Amino acid sequence: EISCSLVGSEMCIRDRAPEEEWNARFAAYCEKYPEMKELWDQYHDKDLPKKLWDNEEFWSYEDKPQATRNLSGELLNKINKVVPNLFGGSADLAPSNKTNLKGEGDFSKADYSGKNLHFGVREQAMTAIGNGLVLHGGVIPYVATFFVFSDYMKPIARLSSLMKVPLIYVLTHDSIGVGEDGPTHEPIEQLAMLRAQPNFHVFRPADAKE
């Protein structure tokens, strides 16, 4: 029988040299490309979102009644100006969720520079991808769909909570009066479900200030 601690120790010894080699290559890269090092530090700065507190433009809104999903879309684009590593998308509902980052292009295998992800109609996979992006680090991802479809996200959203992964969920159309789509699109019990989930922080803003 081999103990887990022994296996762990052996792995540390085995992998020490490759790690040191990688660190040396990274240090050389940073020295050669200081502007990329600055960008790297910015992308891994966990205090970056706090800079929004002192951003007057971020807090200014037109004082008139507006749909909260429109305000949410405006908010995402304001955040994008200050937080360059904001990255995400919707489950084939971006025009309705208002989650498109304007002027940022679409992320695809043909173009890695885009910041808008098109997940398709697959809420569960989208949530898993979002968790993976957070765990990898370097980006602040968000995922979006209609609130009622959080049912399809639930098993993986629960894993977000268990891992304490700060994935951002943008869940719009939180109303029993969503119009022509009828009762299949009217969220009733979903709010209670998410609020009952440990480590899942639910914010339900009613206007621009909130």
Task: Give a label for each model feature.
Residues 19-210:
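Thiamine diphosphate
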Residues 1-12:
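Single conserved hydrophobic/aromatic residue that forms the stacking wall/gate
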